[in-house]
Structure formats: structure tokens, C-alpha cells
Amino acid sequence: MKKHLITGLFAALALTANAQSFKEWLDPEINAVNRAPMHTNYFAYESADAAMQGKKAQSTNYMTLNGTWKFSWVRNADQRPTDFWKVGFNDRGWNNLQVPAVWELNGYGDPIYVNTGYAWRNQFQNNPPEVPTENNHVGSYRREIIVPADWKGKDIIAHFGSVTSNMYLWVNGRYVGYSEDSKLEAEFDLTPYLKPGQTNLIAFQVFRWCDGTYLEDQDFFRYSGVGRDCYLYARNKKRIQDIRITPDLDEAYKNGSLRVTLDLKGSGNVNLELLDAAGKAVATETAKGSGTILMNVENPHKWTAETPYLYTLRATLQGSNEVIPIKVGFRKIELKGDQILVNGQAVLFKGADRHEIDPDGGYVVSPERMIQDIQVMKKFNINAVRTCHYPDDNLWYDLCDQYGLYVVAEANIESHGMGYREKTLAKRTDYAKAHMERNQRNVQRGFNHPSIIFWSLGNEAGFGPNFEACYRWIKNEDSSRAVQYEQAHGNEFTDIDCPMYADYKHMEKYGQRTDAKKPLIQCEYAHAMGNSQGGFKEYWDLIRKYPNLQGGFIWDFVDQSVRWKGKDEIGRAHV
């Protein structure tokens, strides 16, 4: 974890160097300006009782930004308003749009489904990092809010859960920063810009396409806008800035340990309590400042997809009222010989690939829909899910922890439309930083989830030095999990041989190998979109026959349909 002084210095330098240049959206080496460093998925509550209830929307430290915003949409990027962020700007002629919402399902542009090419393929020849100006829709948002007066003296952070494809942010007429990577949250420290207890103007602008779009060529509907919850939250000046947990089991898979790594803003001692599902303390420790401490637990309940038992780690900085709860699952992931083991047992991964998509909301997926997806998976004996092809909403991982699903957590990288060989972005130095940052932020955010057992470097993006560097970084950062990437083709930069659509002959040949050093788990197979997915039994006859064949992930979990009240090619309205 980085020291905050260094992080703040770099952020200040970046802001000075790049402030409001409006060239960021075409520069692959500028993926953020003044964006806060990524941290693990947690929320700091105002009391132990609030922390145990775990309902952050009811916390006094939370303020939603969801709801109605003033909105302006233009078809071409060069038509975008350039002064809308000013406090005195007249937006009375603008429409209203909900946040979160995608534009194309709300009357602004059309939904486009593309598999292997970019959405501009009929009008523009690929030329990274350049993207078209024509048909590069831009949405501009404005909203006035009143920040709670009792937040004065605290740090106030803005959280934008998912914005496609990028965002520029202003507060009270002042430029705050910029962010790319549409499937991970962008957080900004708004403390210098906001006035607690008074009316404040929030304004941001979103482009349909930017240089980062070259890394977001996934096989699904292409939408734009805000896809996840947006909110403000307040933190004490002196606080736990980040907390990482690494559960482990001894060689007999009986007794457990929990390594807790703390990064404090300021100094102080941290009380750590590990509670079982009934709320009984099973281990306590006091950590002295930033650093790592080990908590030992005798014969804990073990976490698996079949037995998803969760403990709660409660972390409290002494002298502060902030309490951070973290769910803990004791489990051990190992690569032994040519098998992956969970708690000493070989697992057959009966997996599915799942896009985060909804027929009504597009990229906006409700908690109810997520729970429905998981319940369907459990009913059909699916025990694993791959997040295709990007990080999902934080809630999805919480639910996988709770219900019991093994997760392959994939970074937001697919450059399929560039091809896999010499033109691949995996070999381009100007996209090296973007590859690395997207993988780093994926790991930094999801580190604490027991359901995540594999990290995935991305999907269908060729292979080259950029992925080699990402693999090395992850293995150094997190030795407790396996790392996979299909385009590594079984070389030393993937712990799993994870091909796509390998046939029976390929599977049997691998199963018969005596020199295999890793398992074969297909990251995609048994293509199931529409009327398909034949020959499934034959795959599983082979998987059950050979121990180094450990399953696969069906492409994909559910058809990507849309209920769109648009018009067909001759102008007839339809749904």
C-alpha cells in the first residue's frame, strides 16, 4: 500500500500537469487525473451497531447522488458544451435523466450489439488512440445538492460506480479531475471543493468513446452513461485508509490464520475483532499503526461454494467512531501438480460466464436481478462464475461470498477488434500503463473477497509484454490466488491452461499428459447463446475421467436480450 504523502504528491503533480487539457480522452498514458487511489471494498460506519447492520445507504456517512440530473446529449463530440460546468450556466432547457441509467435505453442513441469489432467499425478505421468525433455522443450532467452540515471538518469523497467510457468532473465551477476504465469506480476527494451545509453544483461530462474504448471491445451490447450507484461519503481525517485480509489454513487444513494489513492516514492503534456468524468473538488483536498483524483461529468453519460460512472482521481505530466490517471466509487455494485445490480438495468447476447486463436497464443491474442470477445458478448446480469481461458491481462479489460461488475476477481488458498478433495492444508501450492500471485496480479493490479464487488478466486481447508485466505484478502482490489468461496459451504467464472452445480431442490429449504442470479449465466452452450448447455430456465424461481436467465456464449464462422501445429499420415502433 502506498504512503498517502507520496500519493497526494503524485496526484497534485498530475493535476497541475494535466488540468483540464481536454486531451486526456485521446491519450492512453493519461487514464486518470486527481482520481483517488483504489482501495479494498469496504465502508466505514459511524458505530459498531451500524457496522453490524451493514446498510451503508442508511449511514450518516453516506449521501446518494442517484436520482434526477439535468442532462444534455449531443451526437458528435465537437458539439459538446464547454461551459456547462459554470455555476451561473442556464440549464433550464435541458432534459432530466436518472442516474444511474444508460443513454441508449432512454432515448439518446441506439443500442448496438457487436462481437469482435468496435462500434465505429462502419465509419472509422482503427487507429489507436484516436477515436471518431462523428457519432461520438457526449452527455453532460448537472445537479445541485446540499451536503450535510455536520460533514464539515471531514474528508468528503465522491464515488462514481461505473461510467462509460470516461468522465470529466467539476464541483462548484472548479475542475476536479478525470477518469477512464468504465467498469471500476472512480473516486475523487471533493473536500477542497464542497461547502457543507450549503448548495453545491456537481457537473460531469461523459464521452461515448475515448482512447480507453480500445480496451473495452467486449462481446455484448454497447451502451454509454452511468451504470452503477453514485454517492458521497464522509471520512474522519485520521482513519483507516485501507485494510487487506489474507485468510489461510495450516497444512492439515484444520486451523486458520488471518493476516491483516492496515494502511492508516495518521497514526494510532486499531482494535481488531473477528466475530463468527452468531456475533461471538473468536479472536481479538490490537494493531499498532500501519502494518501487518496475524490473527489465529482454532478450527474455523471453512469457506467453499457448498459451505459459504462467513466471519466478520471488525476494525476500529482507537479514538475514532468509525467502524469497518469485512466479511472473512477461511479457505486455501493451492496449485499442486496439475490440479487446483480448495482446502486440500480438487474441485470440478461447473462454471458460467456472466455479463453484467439487464434487459431493461442495460448496464444498470438491480440487486434483485443479481440475486435472481445467483439463485438460478445455484439451482442448476453452477458453482463458479467468470466476470465477463470486466469487474462487476461490488455487490456481486458480496453475494458470491454469501451464497457460495467461486469467482474468476477479470480485468476490464479486451481489444479483440485489434487482432491478436502484431497489432495487439498487448505489445504497444503507449498502452502498457492502461493494461497495468486496470489489473492493479481490479486486484486492489477485490482483494478481500473469499469467493475470488482466480484473477484473470483480461479477455481476447492478444499477448505481449504488457500482460507479462501484469502477471508478474499480481503474483508479487497476491500469492494466495491463481492467475489466468487464455491468450497466454499455457505459457509461464498463466497458472491455468484456460483455452476457449477446445474440442474433445484436445481435451483428451491434455488429460493423458503425464508432464502437465497446471490444470486445464476452459474459460469458455459449450457456446449456449440461442439454440446451441450441444455435446455437453461428452465434455463432462472427459472431465470426470482425467483429474487434470477441472471443468469450464459455459458461454454464456443468459442471453443478452433487450426490451427496447425503439424503432426498426422502416420506422415501426417495437419492444
Identify the residue ranges that each predicted region occupies.
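Surface beta-strand/loop "capping" patches
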Residues: 237-266
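Short hydrophobic beta-strand segments in globular cytosolic domains
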Residues: 176-177, 282, 347
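Accessory carbohydrate-binding/adhesion or oligomerization-edge regions at the termini
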Residues: 20-119, 201-209, 277, 540, ...
